[in-house]
């Protein structure tokens, strides 16, 4: 009846409803079966206890703070922002940190951007999704390493020139939200006696393979 997704089903506007286009065929199928799709995208990224807090927790970061400038929610009066900055319990080299990220984020592969593979990493920034344009914010926080995804070739050169170690763990690390949201929804379901059947998707939507 209802799909809760992180990325919106309709990312690009539909100008012609041609069912030969796979995305349009998917929309038609959803409508035909009366399925509602809700996408919590940047609001989940910004939320306290949301995407970037989950990633920071998975990386074992302590004493976390916001990466980007904060805003204030007009209802709760809570500050919120995208990205987190924190510290590892123990210092690692750049290569060791990349291997650590691969392990704790359950990745088949990742990309490391580093001028010095032996540079110590202790203070870390993380931002789920495509965070290349925010690397200057990581520099302002004087971090040793930045974990994000979708880094372009030229941005990678800019990062090396700035002396910033970056782990491009890919966009798919945001799939961490599936078990987190499932647990949250089941908790609300029990607390409110909603009697809703909740299922966690088992699909792997990462388009990339590592050879």
Feature-to-residue mapping (PLM):
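Hydrophobic structural segments
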Residues: 1-211
